[in-house]
């Protein structure tokens, strides 16, 4: 079956010991007459993905240099003695490559314990052009989704399914059955959001990524009702008894979406960065706020004025507590973005922007490291 497919898909010349690149255009070729020729590259993609699922090292996919070109795929093909052995071993799983892949994916569905693992099977079946496996995995996902699910599992699953719904039309498979699952999981994520946010800072790091994945799905898919999700984000933003980094992130998302105006932001910053708020909590909230849309935050001078005023109110011990979280907040900022922050702070403090920039962009000095090592972090 492998040999006949190489001939049918015009891939015989790639059965060489030297690695050879292959670029595929999955769109229909309208310049040819036969259906087989029109979808040659799409069928090549199905075939190569099937080899990947079977663990046959004849083909390896590379990320396209055009991020938005969902129709473009880049592969590296290379024949090896190991690939020949792997093909022989795959015969035990089915008489044809398609049968063997169906067997492997069906086994993975049976062994799956998380919905994200089933979503991986759906994604692989989707890429392999196996609609019957997609349907079987969808039914299994429906059943598993009725049980207890972690937020990270929901985030991974809806992110994968959403990408298939948005960009999968190029593979000529029916994606409609996936829509109800995404709807149900996104509603469940909305219901879980506030409760999950009562967590420590270690769990908050993972939860922050999950929230951003789920929010991206809400923004990408028109069939989702985002109003309930935003209601929960507003509640999360206003609550004081939840992880402050997650509350800050919720505020940042609402700010991006135009759900918070400048006056409301200024009031929230003043509330969070005040003498009544423990230093580490205020700095952690600001770290959450800084996780999204850096340029939008940098452009708000009032935000940096509030931060400056807040730091002025801290004593030495409180400042040391807050600086740990603030340094983490700026880790994800580029040198250019830090320069722009320096200009803001220089203007507020009446200092030279370049001098401030050098301090912000500098590495931690040994004496600073010693101070941090001597500091008692036990309280938090």
Task: List PLM regions with ranges.
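Extended repeat-based interaction scaffolds and adjacent low-complexity, acidic/S/T/P-biased segments
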Residues: 1-380
